């Protein structure tokens, strides 16, 4: 049996390293895992930030509220495929309004300091010499300039020595771009 079938991502490799049985159940047997609150809040936050950037949202509360109205109504400019899921997540986690707003405004302020046309949630897939493909998503990319990965938790140590950004840069041929985990 070959464990690493199909494309693998950094998070899949982490799962395999941490618990091969859990990896096998999820990616080989296709047994769904329930997402926890932290993962769901992270997905919601990433979706809000992507939508806010796509709509060229100003970094203030009124503009944030307008984005949330679109998300709650399932009417997204950017993340069409995620409309229903983000609306459901917002309905479930609307009590986290203040922290979602603060993180989004922080991200928008950082984006406002950049120059160039951003690409959001850039998917890549690159074949490795061993025959397996590496895949991933880049949260925020300005080709040749910036490669950012939004982090909504504060587990800094987990990422200090992580090869994730280097793998993402290599996978997208963006080796010269400034790479950063952006802790919101």
Predicted features, each with a name:
Residues 13-57, 121-122:
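Nuclease catalytic cores
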Residues 118-184:
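Mg2+/Mn2+-dependent nuclease catalytic core
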Residues 44-123, 127-128:
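A non-catalytic, helix-rich entry segment at domain boundaries
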Residues 11-16, 26-28, 34, 114, ...:
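Surface-exposed loop/turn and secondary-structure junction residues enriched for glycine/proline
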Residues 39, 101-104, 165:
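Hydrophobic alpha-helical segments
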Residues 1-12:
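Short acidic, Pro/Gly- and aromatic-enriched capping/linker segments at domain boundaries
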Residues 8, 40, 44, 160-163:
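Generic recognition of stable, solvent-exposed alpha-helical segments in well-folded globular domains
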């Amino acid at each position: 049996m070959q464990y690493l079938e199909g494309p693998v991502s950094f998070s899949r490799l982490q799962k395999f390293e941490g618990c091969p049985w859990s990896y096998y159940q999820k990616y080989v047997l296709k047994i769904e895992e329930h997402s926890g609150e932290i993962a769901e809040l992270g997905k919601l936050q990433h979706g809000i930030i992507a939508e806010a950037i796509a709509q060229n949202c100003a970094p203030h509360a009124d503009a944030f509220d307008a984005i949330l109205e679109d998300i709650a109504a399932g009417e997204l400019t950017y993340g069409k495929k995620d409309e229903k899921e983000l609306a459901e997540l917002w309905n479930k986690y609307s009590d986290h309004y203040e922290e979602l707003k603060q993180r989004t405004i922080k991200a928008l302020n950082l984006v406002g300091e950049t120059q160039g046309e951003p690409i959001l949630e850039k998917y890549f897939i690159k074949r490795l010499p061993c025959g397996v493909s590496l895949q991933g998503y880049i949260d925020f990319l300005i080709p040749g300039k910036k490669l950012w990965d939004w982090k909504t938790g504060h587990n800094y140590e987990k990422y200090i020595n992580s090869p994730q950004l280097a793998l993402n840069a290599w996978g997208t041929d963006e080796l010269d771009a400034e790479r950063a985990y952006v802790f919101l």
